[in-house]
């Protein structure tokens, strides 16, 4: 049996193999891992894809598995840890309805040497989508109070001299990641500009999701998805948390032109709207709490519990996550 690749694609799915998964399964040098949930078909199978069945997950030597609820998007946490267990050098995450373009693997190096577009003298929140199109559109999790503000100016800058981007967020064409308010009131398909990238310097925030996202090893600890919040919230909260801890290390997030297009699975938009309420009402408060936090990463869930962003369940789950990463030598 050939050795498992060191580059992983992590997905959780409750559907039979989709067009996106069949396409990803054909990529060379990448190991696709699908994390099953209670709703996943028991006969799920696809060549070149590792399906982590319920039984296999429960047999893993991971404390996180024992604490993690079923039927939640946070099931992806098991896939991240499985990748780390198997020596991951890169972790890419997506969903089963994001189909890669032929140019999908055109990622950026960790150290963005040379010129790159950087937000200059920007406000706290930057709508990255405005730098890839002229449409009235904003990413899921972007504060509604900031939607009508002008985008921050950008320049091609050589400073900061080093621009380190351990997390890189690709956009998605056709059905990009937007909130239910956008879909209910505008709902237009979008095609973003090509060959464009935007680095958000430390101190500048934009929500990023789990739908087309590359993580380098130094950011692996920040992959943790909370389970006590709705699935429409978990990756956005995770993204803001990750940005805060990257900023503390003088690092940032890179956004780049779409490497996938989305043929979106069915969603009840009214249900999405209800799930997203805290994104509409508490995002700025969350970032204020994060910016005021200066202790280590291991204590962040306790801090968020005090401000009622998560429940005790996530404090316990996060302790298990930190314990597992420590045992795996990834902390």
Q: Model-derived features: where do they sit?
A:
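N-proximal low-complexity "stem/linker" segments adjacent to membrane-targeting elements
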Residues: 1-31
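Active-site-proximal specificity loops/subdomain of glycosyltransferases
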Residues: 40-88, 102-114
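Conserved catalytic core of nucleotide-sugar-dependent glycosyltransferases
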Residues: 58-63, 102-227
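Short aromatic/hydrophobic "clamp" motif used to bind/position activated sugar donors
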Residues: 91
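Acidic metal-phosphate-binding loop of nucleotide-sugar-dependent transferases
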Residues: 97-100
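A short, conserved alpha-helix in the catalytic core of glycosyltransferases
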Residues: 207, 213, 230-251
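Active-site donor/metal-binding and catalytic loop motifs
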Residues: 218-229, 251-273
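Long, compositionally biased intrinsically disordered regions
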Residues: 271-331
């Amino acid at each position: 049996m050939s050795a498992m690749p060191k580059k992983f694609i992590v997905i959780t799915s409750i559907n039979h193999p989709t067009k996106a998964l069949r396409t990803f399964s054909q990529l060379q040098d990448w190991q696709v891992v699908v994390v099953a949930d209670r709703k996943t078909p028991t006969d799920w199978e696809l060549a070149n894809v590792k399906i982590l069945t319920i039984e296999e997950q429960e047999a893993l030597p991971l404390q996180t598995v024992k604490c993690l609820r079923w039927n939640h998007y946070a099931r992806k946490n098991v896939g991240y840890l499985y990748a780390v267990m198997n020596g991951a050098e890169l972790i890419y995450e997506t969903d089963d309805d994001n189909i890669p373009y032929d140019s999908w693997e055109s990622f950026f190096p960790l150290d963005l040497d040379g010129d790159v577009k950087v937000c200059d003298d920007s406000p706290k929140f930057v709508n990255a989508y405005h730098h890839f199109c002229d449409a009235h559109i904003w990413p899921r999790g972007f504060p509604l109070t900031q939607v009508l503000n002008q985008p921050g100016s950008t320049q091609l800058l050589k400073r900061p001299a080093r621009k380190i981007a351990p997390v890189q967020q690709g956009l998605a064409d056709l059905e990009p990641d937007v909130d239910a308010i956008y879909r209910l009131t505008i709902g237009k398909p979008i095609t973003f500009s090509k060959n464009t990238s935007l680095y958000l310097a430390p101190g500048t925030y934009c929500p990023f999701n789990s739908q087309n996202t590359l993580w380098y090893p130094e950011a692996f600890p920040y992959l943790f998805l909370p389970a006590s919040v709705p699935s429409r919230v978990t990756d956005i909260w995770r993204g803001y948390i990750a940005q805060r801890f990257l900023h503390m290390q003088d690092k940032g997030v890179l956004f780049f032109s779409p490497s996938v297009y989305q043929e979106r699975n069915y969603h009840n938009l009214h249900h999405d709207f209800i799930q997203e309420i805290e994104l509409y009402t508490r995002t700025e408060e969350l970032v204020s709490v994060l910016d005021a936090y200066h202790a280590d990463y291991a204590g962040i869930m306790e801090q968020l519990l005090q401000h009622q962003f998560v429940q005790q369940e996530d404090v316990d789950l996060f302790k298990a996550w930190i314990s597992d990463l420590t045992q795996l030598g990834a902390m």
